[in-house]
């Protein structure tokens, strides 16, 4: 068996095209276009790349993109004040603060300062709580994008045994909630998990988000399983690889996401979807 690649790049492009059409329709109806404020603190190279991609995607679909590039020495109070300004700005529908933040700034304070109706990253406790209660509104972007990828396969997720490897607030935990909502029997694995291999081998669906190249050997994958690889790791050679041993895993799986071109593009597409949702549901 050779797995079918799930083409996140193509699916994300299709979403962006649909969003662009919706923005055009809003303009023609005399409505304002959605606005996204993107805040970057410091000059972390990876963060700069991510932020650049998000701003470019905004412009592509016709959103207003507000850029705030702050020095790494910016105080916590100054950042919170900027968030307050964006919260009160009626032209801004979504506020994104690029993580990680400098050590002197408390991430939880920043996330909780963003109004829940402008939390297009889906990290605010209100939005995570809504997902936990099975009534999601603004959803965490990477898990949301993964659910879109799963839907594209046509596979019925109800009753599947799913294993999520990684328990971060950004991916692992909300991913487990999304899969529960989609009818999976979900196991979340983390650094204290025993017998990880046994759990992965028994899974119909595996989502891996740990940030370690080749962390899951390909021969652990159950024949016919679906593999979602969230990891993006750069080797010394410059090659980008995921958290799963792709070449071997693709001989076992039915569907697999490549790295790059799998989950990554969907995170940004979901961010744009959330921004339009916030505009239409909360701010029109």
Curated annotation (Swiss-Prot):
Keyword Membrane attributed: no
Alphabetized SUPFAM superfamilies for the sequence: Aminoacid dehydrogenase-like, N-terminal domain, NAD(P)-binding Rossmann-fold domains
GO biological process: L-histidine biosynthetic process; methionine biosynthetic process; purine nucleotide biosynthetic process; tetrahydrofolate interconversion
Subunit structure and binding partners: Homodimer.
InterPro entries reported in the protein's UniProt record: Aminoacid_DH-like_N_sf, NAD(P)-bd_dom_sf, THF_DH/CycHdrlase, THF_DH/CycHdrlase_cat_dom, THF_DH/CycHdrlase_CS, THF_DH/CycHdrlase_NAD-bd_dom
UniProt keyword Transmembrane helix present: no
Protein name, entry field: Bifunctional protein FolD
NCBIfam families (UniProt xref): PRK10792.1, PRK14186.1
